[in-house]
Amino acid sequence: MASNNVAQFAAELKMPAGVLLEQLQAAGVQKASEDDALSETDKARLLDHLRKSHGATDGDKRKITLTRRHTSEIKQADATGKARTIQVEVRKKRTFVKRDDVSETGADQAQAQTDEQAEAELKRREEEARREAELLEKQAQELRERQERLEREEAERRAREEAAEAERRRAEEEAAAKREAAAAQAEAAQQAAAAREEAQRAQSEQSEQSAQDEARAAAERAAQREAAKKAEDAAREAADKARAEQEEIRKRREAAEAEARAIREMMNTPRRAQVKAVEPPKPAEQPAAKAAEAKGTLHKPAKPAGEAAAARPAAKKPASGAPAPAAAPAGDRNKKPGTGKSGWQDDAAKRRGIKTRGDSSGGVDRGWRGGPKGRGKHQDSASSFQAPTEPIVREVHVPETISVADLAHKMAIKASEVIKVMMKMGQMVTINQVLDQETAMIVVEELGHRALAAKLDDPEALLVEGEIGSDAEQLPRPPVVTVMGHVDHGKTSLLDYIRRAKVAAGEAGGITQHIGAYHVETPRGVVTFLDTPGHEAFTAMRARGAKATDIVILVVAADDGVMPQTKEAISHAKAGGVPIVVAINKIDKPEANPDRVKQELVAEGVVPEEYGGDSPFVPVSAKTGVGIDDLLENVLLQAEVLELKAPVESPAKGIVIEAKLDKGKGPVATVLVQSGTLNRGDVVLAGTAYGRVRAMLDENGKPTKEAGPSIPVEIQGLSEVPGAGEEVIVLPDERKAREIALFRQGKFRDVKLAKQQAAKLESMLEQMGEGEVQNLPLIIKADVQGSQEALVQSLLKLSTNEVRVQIVHSAVGGISESDVNLATASKAVIIGFNTRADAQARKLAEANGIDIRYYNIIYDAVDEVKAAMSGMLAPEKREVVTGMVEVRQVFKVPKVGAVAGCMVTDGVVKRSSSVRVLRNNVVIFTGELDSLKRFKDDVKEVKQGFECGMSIKNFNDIVEGDQFEVFEVTEVARTL
């Protein structure tokens, strides 16, 4: 019925009339009672108010969703050849939104585009569905129907649950209503009783009030218990019912899933297995065979495809498998001779089925392209290979160098994978490129394998085993004493006096540039001396001397004190743990001050014995011989304290003090024997060099047959010049020495190449950052390796950010034609240190214009290279102010611009000078003079006190009162 008043409208809305009146009042509709009339306008105002207050959206815009279904049928033949009809259903969901009138045109266009896209999408999906339908079979349709049935059952279950929930809520509401009614009745009874008792007994009001409270609480508890019991019973019933329904649904779902799983397995099973399943059973074979025998024709019993392949090998090798009667039936015994490998077959086996990729029918187990000779060789198990699901982690032994291809082979992956990982790491490599050990281990770990640093098949392990096995008798040996100190402090002169020789007088420049080894016989025994250079360039030589020594004589000039190389010698001695004997030389000079030297040495940590230290200080003079005996006494005393011993009757071991390339003798090495005895004819190994000792000379150049511990000798017969500081060891077999030397050469070469390759990118980036850097290429040839090493290091230290020394090649020996050819190709300068070029090399150098420089003092070589580098530096530009000009008047000349009439106030103005324009002592322009005139004549210069006319290139903003600062730019040569 129509709701014409408030009460009827409240009944229609199923809400109290009082609440509706309050909402109408809030909406601005004034209604006093339930009987007041209510118009449609009032209802609309109430609806707007409720939408605004509850956050409802504008009702004008509405959204409509349409779902369209399109069903089509596709006919497809299955594996058995039967035609099956497959229904394809395409569902499409479309949403329409009502928009404003202003955007109707745009909406129509958008709708048209949407329709076109929808049609295209529909066609695409139909095509996809048709392609997918080709792979579907009848079981897929049955699975979809079961899933729909499950969905319907799930929807029914949800409906039942919602009904149970509604029933439970209704029961709770009834229980709450009953509880409220009981509470109201109890409260009314309590109030009546209280009124009666209050009228009768005013004095016991407080006690009666407490009784009323207790009664009210008891009534409320009773009502609550009753309501809770009812609600609990209803909830229990609903829960039992829901649990039963869920259990039933779960069972149905599990059954449906099991059935779907079986269908999927059946669909995924190869068709060969399905063909096997429909083959005739075995019991039917025997009657067929008997019938065939009755006809007089021999037949083999038909076998399944799987058994035929297994039966043939058994027939060939009866001893390897089951007994022969089990593998071949009785029909094989009657086989005709010459029938070949295949034998007789029954009619069913001769009728071959259609050849398909997944099916090999006809009882013959062949592949897709199996030939007549390959029958029965390929089993079904060959096609059932399962790829490993987990990645295989391998332990990869990485040597010091390895190529990319070998590294990939060790990890059982393609080389392209290793190249990809290297590209991700920022390095481009090829398949044959050699990687160093560190880079290769990082690549292995990036690919998920374990990298182990490998030292496999190292022939040097034999040397370690030989060291462990040597247990010869230890006998006393002479001490090895190294003389160290600053340059020009008298080390060689001191040794000359001890040896009664004059080595210092024959040295170039009066300075030692080689390490010398001598042994001196004294009344108290033999002492071996090593004389080291004091120049700063020979740091490596001094370090080798300290490594091979037992005692260090530190020579300090009494008039010079502690110098940089003195401090370096102290640090070398302390690093080697070698005792120091200090010789304060040149005490015969008037300016000598030994006490000052002692104080400086104490500051460096060398404390004399009189100050409580452990270093003897001996004042000596290499010229007069004062204190030489005391020095030797202290040295031998230190040697006795050290108790130096070494095995004598054992293969020799030592260290290379110096090495050089002699044109007549070949590679020559000065060796200090540290243990054992070195004999002529022994096979020695020194670093990458090996050979048999052909000749052995002492320090005086006299031949000797053997050298014991602490004796220096010069040996010949090595394959190449060994590195200074290399360990020398005697081996029993030349073949083993060659093997170890070649192994070291290959390892050194591979490591060097790998490091060069790793540093290529960095050096390229450095060169890009440096920009234009001048290079001074040099080829260095020296007489001995120590001098060559020192010269190379000294020259490399001269490099700056603008000029860099590039050592193209450095070696020991004379200058040959190959060196000149290398210098021609690299445009290098050849430096010969105590060496000369042969006749052919000199002619070739003159023809090609190659500069060859000879030096015998390291100072001169370093100074001349430094001067050449200074000449390669870009000159420095300096500005020199030559004059000041004041503008007195400005003239505007057509086609010329502004011309300033000026007065030269200071210096001179030249036509070729540059100029700065100053206005209020602020530079506003810098440029060049365009013209300089005096009385309409061009002049080259104007001196102070004269007037002139000037114009400036590309500048016309000249004002009276401006000043011109005239300057010239000069280039000044720079020095390092």
Curated annotation (Swiss-Prot):
What's the superkingdom here? Bacteria
Question: Low complexity composition bias: which ranges?
Answer: 104-115, 182-194, 201-212, 285-295, 303-331
Region spans: G1? 485-492
Q: Which residues bind GTP?
A: 485-492, 531-535, 585-588
Q: What is the lineage of its organism?
A: Bacteria, Pseudomonadati, Pseudomonadota, Betaproteobacteria, Burkholderiales
Regions of biased composition (Basic and acidic residues) lie at: 48-63, 120-181, 213-264
Q: What is this protein called?
A: Translation initiation factor IF-2
Q: Name one GO cellular component term.
A: cytosol
GO molecular-function terms, A-Z: GTP binding; GTPase activity; translation initiation factor activity
Family according to the record? Belongs to the TRAFAC class translation factor GTPase superfamily. Classic translation factor GTPase family. IF-2 subfamily.
Q: Which gene encodes it?
A: infB
The scientific name of the source species is Burkholderia thailandensis (strain ATCC 700388 / DSM 13276 / CCUG 48851 / CIP 106301 / E264)
